[in-house]
């Protein structure tokens, strides 16, 4: 790709130099805000995600504000105004309705919808958009239309917008196809990993062990000397975190939510913080997560995700996270893999059937049944699983890294093209 023949200063930090014939105007010159309130009974409810704007899933959690939504028309650009939904935006391909937290932009006749989808979803614009927001709490802020409309954009003539959108459609489609291929590989690796876990925690390691009927059709036979117990008899504590959200702070104690349980343990990278006072209150309420406990997500899209707390970090949990403390005669690692296995995951799935929002209660969780071998056998099984899945997890890390590089490459191409740093066509 080549550069344009001549450039000029845009006068805008996030844009830098732009092609000489491009115009710099405020966003309000290219869009008007659509503020028509409608009901989701009249207009299909839409979800605004990082991947774009889509029809709302039937089982998504609904609010009581179905009659208090914003109208969206085909070709409108919609963006979530809150920083914790950063990047959730896109052009809608249909009429519908969105929640009031979103800003709906109707393009004027000086900007194309397909071009605006790339421009306003570019990394540089998104950063500029949220930079103009105002704080709700320490780590959460929102950007209103009054602030958004003042952001300056650099826009080429309509014909050039069309060429840019066409070029990016082709370029990003190739990258997306490569990402999909890598994701397929990860799915296959995860499937292989799950097979290893499932077999080990239901059949054991001795192929010559005497077997008995488990009494459950989808589990089949299990080693004769294994016990079938309910989870409440395998853990000395099964509790969840706080049912109210404390004020977050810039410094303080980690406050674990469902997004912080990463499938192996706790990822503290983006963990919210709370004050010492709130921390002490929640510890007294039984919301502290201790080293050696297994964390299980019990609410939301990642319900069923499991991680073992192996660190000494003092932290408390939200109600979306259950904390399970293994009894002293049990292997923490084995029980973590048991909770990851289809024995428990199938029961989680069944308990959520027909629910508007993915969720399991502590009462149901405590009464899930599971298979329990003797402690020494638990340790052998856990060590075997660790050994067998290690190369699989390494392959997943490498493939995930390749996906990240492809996503980064995609964003670089979009940013370079929509800000005029390179010329297409």
Pin down the residues of each PLM region:
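Amphipathic alpha-helical coiled-coil/heptad-repeat segments
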Residues: 1-15, 21, 156-209, 371-425
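Non-catalytic DNA-recognition/assembly elements of restriction-modification systems
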Residues: 7-38, 150, 158, 162, ...
């Amino acid at each position: 790709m080549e550069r344009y023949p001549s450039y000029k200063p845009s006068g805008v930090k996030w844009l830098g130099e732009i092609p000489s014939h491009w115009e710099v105007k405020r966003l309000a010159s290219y869009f008007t805000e659509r503020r028509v309130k409608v009901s989701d009974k009249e207009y299909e409810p839409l979800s605004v995600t990082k991947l774009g704007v889509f029809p709302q899933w039937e089982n998504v959690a609904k609010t009581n504000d179905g009659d208090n939504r914003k109208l969206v028309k085909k070709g409108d650009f919609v963006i979530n105004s809150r920083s914790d939904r950063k990047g959730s935006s896109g052009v809608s391909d249909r009429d519908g309705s969105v929640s009031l937290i979103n800003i709906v932009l109707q393009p004027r006749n000086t900007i194309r919808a397909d071009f605006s989808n790339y421009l306003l979803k570019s990394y540089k614009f998104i950063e500029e958009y949220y930079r103009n927001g105002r704080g709700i709490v320490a780590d959460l802020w929102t950007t209103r239309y009054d602030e958004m409309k003042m952001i300056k954009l650099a826009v080429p003539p309509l014909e050039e917008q069309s060429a840019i959108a066409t070029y990016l459609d082709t370029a990003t489609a190739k990258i997306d196809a490569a990402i999909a291929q890598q994701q397929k590989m990860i799915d296959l690796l995860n499937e292989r990993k799950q097979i290893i876990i499932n077999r080990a925690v239901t059949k054991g390691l001795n192929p010559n062990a005497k077997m008995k009927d488990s009494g459950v059709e989808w589990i089949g036979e299990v080693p004769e000397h294994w016990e079938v117990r309910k989870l409440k008899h395998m853990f000395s504590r099964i509790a969840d975190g706080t049912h109210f959200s404390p004020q977050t702070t810039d410094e303080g104690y980690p406050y674990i939510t469902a997004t912080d349980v990463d499938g192996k343990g706790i990822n503290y990278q983006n963990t919210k913080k709370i004050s010492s006072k709130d921390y002490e209150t929640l510890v007294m309420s039984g919301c502290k997560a201790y080293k050696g406990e297994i964390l299980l997500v019990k609410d939301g899209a990642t319900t069923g995700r499991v991680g073992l707390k192996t660190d000494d970090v003092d932290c408390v949990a939200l109600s979306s996270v259950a904390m399970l403390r293994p009894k002293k005669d049990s292997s923490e690692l084995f029980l973590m893999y048991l909770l990851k296995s289809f024995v428990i995951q199938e029961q989680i799935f069944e308990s959520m059937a027909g629910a508007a929002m993915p969720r399991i209660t502590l009462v149901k969780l405590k009464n899930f049944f599971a298979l329990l071998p003797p402690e020494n056998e638990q340790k052998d099984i856990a060590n075997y699983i660790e050994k067998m899945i290690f190369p699989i997890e390494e392959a997943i890390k490498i493939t995930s890294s390749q996906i990240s590089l492809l996503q980064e490459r995609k964003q670089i191409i979009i940013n370079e093209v929509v800000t005029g740093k390179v010329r297409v066509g």
